[in-house]
Amino acid sequence: MTEKIRVRYAPSPTGHLHIGNARTAIFNWLFARHYNGQFIIRIEDTDLARNVKDGEKSQLDNLQWLGIDWDEGPDKANSKYAPYRQTERAAQGVYQKYIDELLASGKAYKSYKTEATLKEEREAQAQAHQAPHYVYEYAGMTKEQIKDAQAKDEAAGLKSVVRFRVPENHDYQWQDLVKGEVKINSKEIGGDWVIQKADGMPTYNFAVVIDDHLMEITHVLRGDDHVSNTPKQLMVYEAFGWKAPAFGHMALIIKAETGKKLSKRDEDTLQFIEQYRELGYLPEAMFNFIGLLGWSPVGENEIFTREQFKEMFDENRFTKANAKFDAKKLAWVNNQWMRSEKEKVMPQLIHELVKAGLINDQQAKNDADHLAKIIEIAGVDGIKATSEIAPLAEYPFFKLHDISKEDRQSWLETDDGQKVAAAFTEKIKALAEDEFKAGHILQIIRDLQHDLQIKGRPLWNPIRLITTHEVQGPNLPEILAVMGKDWTIKNIQLTVAV
């Protein structure tokens, strides 16, 4: 591309970073980085009632965790475009200037209709099987009559909003980066719409145009649910005679199991970045998975780094079909990343043992190599998130279960069980410290199989029980070798004492 790319991610601080919003941020970031453009963060915080404490901080923190940086934003202001919060821009009169222009030109007007009146109109339209639309209250009036009516409403203490006058029967069309040509007639808009609320704040569809124009945004990549907003925004661009940016509306994200739209209100589905962070998913894996929601790379590979995404990004490879959010696929992607980055992830895995109360911080620091071996044997290659390692490693590495009465009767109180337990104990005690390795321990068990003519569970279960108090678990010789001779003998003595 020859023009200088400027794209933005403009979250509302009304909650945590959602999978859908993260995708918007990721693809705008990739677009900017691929074309050596600029990626801007703008905070759209005009919905004061819904803004939550630390909402902005949470959004930005999770973006950084995903590996997304920005060229401009609330913390990286460029004086030419600042400020980067809409409330601050509103306080400076940025939007009021343009609202006044539209009022003066007659392209917008003040409306004093109450919520009760609007509700009655919507109900009447529903009963008449009509699409909801705004009914112009000054129809047939002269300018003087309108002025008098508004003065009376003002005197009565009614609050006004400002509505944009929608052109009649006008087609708004654009060449969408994802969907191709899109055309929507003004009749589908729902009538004149609010550009300034009663509290003086601009509405989303108005403020976003002013901001994108003043910040020289060249491309707007966002979710498919914004298609219906685009005609409203285009009519504002037309009203001021401004060039609109290129629009791209990415495919809807749906749940793989149900085919329904991924909804923030669906509490049965984990769909916020913060939730996956808490579970121990890796940022590289989250970026990787989200980067394939509605975008298709060349070839069959599904595991990519951020740098690879940046290099191969192509806006022509967005898919039109709905993107499936598959939690199992995300778990698989995270597992692949954990396995390939095991050394890098190991400190996080060890920290999970600290969080679970299995070790303290000092042990985590001093015994890192030993703990890494435990984690490896416990089955790290099979988990989908780091938080799953503590339950796997807890027994028998840090705690021992009580041997059940049933297991004791089945495997330790039989003639064969007693023979195996006694013979293994004798041989393991005789094994030198420097030979206490998995290979030597396995050979002892094989020799017992030959000498006692006992094999399978009757051989292995008594040994497992006296050493780990479990009849199932990871590779037994490896467990004993890692935990050491003293630990093994101590457990055997504990079993005999019981």
UniProtKB/Swiss-Prot annotation:
Keyword hit for Transmembrane: no
Motif ('HIGH' region): 11-21
The EC number(s) this enzyme carries: 6.1.1.17
Binding site for ATP: K264
Gene Ontology MF terms in the entry: ATP binding; glutamate-tRNA ligase activity; tRNA binding; zinc ion binding
CDD domains: GluRS_core
Reactions this protein catalyses: tRNA(Glu) + L-glutamate + ATP = L-glutamyl-tRNA(Glu) + AMP + diphosphate
Positions of short motif 'KMSKS' region: 261-265
Domain of life from the UniProt record: Bacteria
InterPro entries: aa-tRNA-synth_I_cd-bd, aa-tRNA-synth_I_codon-bd_sub2, aa-tRNA-synth_I_CS, aa_tRNA-synth_I_cd-bd_sf, Glu-tRNA-ligase_bac/mito, Glu/Gln-tRNA-synth, Glu/Gln-tRNA-synth_Ib_cat-dom, GluQ/Sye
Compartmental location: Cytoplasm
GO BP terms, alphabetized: glutamyl-tRNA aminoacylation
GO CC list: cytosol
Keywords: Aminoacyl-tRNA synthetase, ATP-binding, Cytoplasm, Ligase, Nucleotide-binding, Protein biosynthesis
Keyword Nucleus: no
Assembly: Monomer.
Function: Catalyzes the attachment of glutamate to tRNA(Glu) in a two-step reaction: glutamate is first activated by ATP to form Glu-AMP and then transferred to the acceptor end of tRNA(Glu).
UniProt similarity note: Belongs to the class-I aminoacyl-tRNA synthetase family. Glutamate--tRNA ligase type 1 subfamily.
Name of this protein: Glutamate--tRNA ligase
Species of the source: Oenococcus oeni (strain ATCC BAA-331 / PSU-1)
